[in-house]
Amino acid sequence: MESKTYYIFRNPDNPNYPVYHIINEKHVFKYTDFKIKEIIQVEPDYSKPDLKFTEYEDGIYATNYINEIAKISLLDVNNIDKLLFNFSYESFGPTYRLYSRFLSDNRLDLCDYLIEKNIKLTQFADYCIFNFMVNPSKESLMYIIDHNDFFQISWETIFKSIIPFTRDGEITDYLITLMDNINYKIDYDDIIKNVITNSYTLDIKNIEPIIEKTNINLYDVFKYACSRGKLHIIDYLLDKRIEYDFYELIKCDISTRTLNFFIEKGYYLDGIAIDIIINSEPHNIYKMVKFLIDQKYLTQDLITKQLLDTIIKTNINNLRLFINDFDVVDLVDLDMIIVMAIEFNSMELINWCMNNGININKYMSIIMKKCRPTIISGLIELGAQIPNDKSYYDPTIIENYCMGSDCISYLKTIIEKEFDTAENIIHNIIENRPHIEILKYLLTEVQTEHITIPKLTNVIIRNYYYDNDYCPEYYEDLIKSGIQFDIEQQTIIQIIEKKIVDVQGVIFSNCELSSNLKILFVTIMTDNIDILEFLLEINKYNQDYLQWALIFSSNNITILEYIINNTNVNPISFKQEMSTMAGHNNYYSIDYLRLNGFYTNNDVPTDSKLADFMNEIGIDIFNPNF
């Protein structure tokens, strides 16, 4: 152990199997959150016979037992001296975190102390020192300015960072005077534009000294504020009697908030103004046109092919703004619109094209390839004809998107034309858990009285694994619909429902289930130690079966400890498999494995037996965020 003095870094995620993360004293400021004011000094409890202690990474350790020694203030100069300067300069991490910590607490004396010790800002710290401060006081901000000979932060960064913090112009005024005194040339136009862009709660007092005391281009600032919708700045500059031409101003891609502001000030949007707005292709063309339509400023005579082309080029769905209130049929190419509407699955635009003369049957081959089943069903109900050529049928669209009862018209047509069978469709869509009404319909088309669906096993396991989602009503509905659960599926459901006696009876009567790995996996996943004991005994503690049980239990410490303590399987031999399995969604399991020496950073190969088994179920063990 490198040091006998440690501090709590993270408390256990699982109190039943505690793993304490602790850090040694030279890494306290490197690893602790800058908001923390106090830290607990601890030591491993060496009196415990089963004490475990391991190093995770540089300066971070883990143990299962600790004794608390004292609470240590991180705002006490003596503690800071001990934590920082008994060790190397690099050990306490980016120095801006130290300054931000003390500046946020207005502990300027501690900043003095750091400067006396020549603790300079590390590289790229200019913005970070400001970003990590929490509600800094005026005194803290002035401290940075007055000590910038030491900090060496660019003055541009100081302006851009400090102005949003201030609630009066005093600091800004002080900075401007300072720049004049040291003869430092600064681009105040850029400063103001940056502040306007990046400040959500900008007060006019923040920038008033720049406007009043520097030679910035007020008209440029005015236009920029108009484009950003900063109404309080616009109003302030108007009070300064800034000169502008309204027609020129609206060419500058102003926001809808700004436009509404000027309308409320008494400006009338005549045909010239509207023509300028809609033909200047502003970046917010959708919002601008919607505003003009909603406020009844946009009239039929102002709508041009150029405007519609711009709207459509931005997004075909934007055309929906016009189709209900204006006559635009002669201004667009309907054949182009229908193709784009199909591509974007826009039923509203498809309907509009049909109502204006498009023969939808000409496009059904494209629609079958591009559109979701709900749209195809809707078109069938409107009289569209599905072509007889099976090559247009894409079963993957059914598999991925046919989840709701509004797909039934399309399914009915597919089955009638013998493009697919109801039974095959059921097998293909079941893993995506379709609406029960779809299954009820499909089952009426199945020739046999009852069918079994092997893929349903994976659905049950996967839903429970990812979401702890077991909905008995859904499975009861499946049974009522005529789906027959096979013996494997019945057993898995009984395990989930904790019907231990029933499970044992079924397995006794069906020997092939005793070594079934999916049943073992669900048993461990559901914390069924009684069933696990039964399975291990009936398999006579077969080593291959034990190894699978060990690997599956990597996400369940209770089961894992039971297997380790009650069998002779060696976890060290299966580090890779256990680490991959645990890495999926239980980080406290990883902590447990690491503490006990069962962890490795290397995943199993993607073609390993474990990966193949989990892939068959549909569980991605290589993606912890899935």
UniProtKB/Swiss-Prot annotation:
<feature type="repeat" description="ANK 1">
    <location>
        <begin position="217"/>
        <end position="246"/>
    </location>
</feature>
<protein>
    <recommendedName>
        <fullName>Putative ankyrin repeat protein L768</fullName>
    </recommendedName>
</protein>
<feature type="repeat" description="ANK 3">
    <location>
        <begin position="421"/>
        <end position="451"/>
    </location>
</feature>
<feature type="repeat" description="ANK 5">
    <location>
        <begin position="547"/>
        <end position="571"/>
    </location>
</feature>
<feature type="repeat" description="ANK 4">
    <location>
        <begin position="515"/>
        <end position="545"/>
    </location>
</feature>
<keyword id="KW-0677">Repeat</keyword>
<keyword id="KW-0040">ANK repeat</keyword>
<dbReference type="InterPro" id="IPR002110">
    <property type="entry name" value="Ankyrin_rpt"/>
</dbReference>
<feature type="repeat" description="ANK 2">
    <location>
        <begin position="333"/>
        <end position="362"/>
    </location>
</feature>
<dbReference type="InterPro" id="IPR036770">
    <property type="entry name" value="Ankyrin_rpt-contain_sf"/>
</dbReference>
